[in-house]
Amino acid sequence: MSSFDKTMKFNFSDDSAETNVNEVLITVYDALQEKGYNPINQIVGYLLSGDPAYIPRHRDARNLIRKLERDELIEELVKSYLEQHKEA
């Protein structure tokens, strides 16, 4: 069997991606607060709609959040929530 016929598995460390998502969310949250918006409502609006108008340009928040896929953001939020609220 040729090596082209085998399914390859790609492994990478999620640590840098997780840190990046956390940093972006914190930066966006802070930017929204500084501009007087309710950060949770605005982030939820962005995640549901994909419309970047929910995120201000302040502190480059809009550009930062658009570099990440919305499903990546949701995945990290769910993962973080479950890790913090999991019963032992």
Curated annotation (Swiss-Prot):
InterPro entries on file: IreB
Coiled coil: none
Pfam families: IreB
Record-stated family: Belongs to the UPF0297 family.
UniProt cross-references to NCBIfam families, sorted A to Z: PRK05473.1 (NF003997)
Name of the protein in its database record: UPF0297 protein YrzL
Organism, scientific name: Bacillus subtilis (strain 168)
